[in-house]
Amino acid sequence: MTYEEFREDVLNGIKAFQNDWREGQKVFNYIDSKYRVARKVQFDYGVDCFYRDDLIDKFIETAYKLL
């Protein structure tokens, strides 16, 4: 899977989540449920888009590197 395919999968996948969630929460939870690397990105790499939407791109990039 290329980075572009991964990113597209994540951005399409979050459409099913609750609308009252921030985008970062959706991205975090989707990657956590499907790829199981979200907490590693959060704790080992210090990138946390759950609380900071401005880190979504960096979070997706870091998660992809761990696949």
Q: Model regions: which residues?
A:
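N-terminal acidic leader/helix
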Residues: 1-28
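Charged low-complexity stretches with an acidic bias
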Residues: 51-67
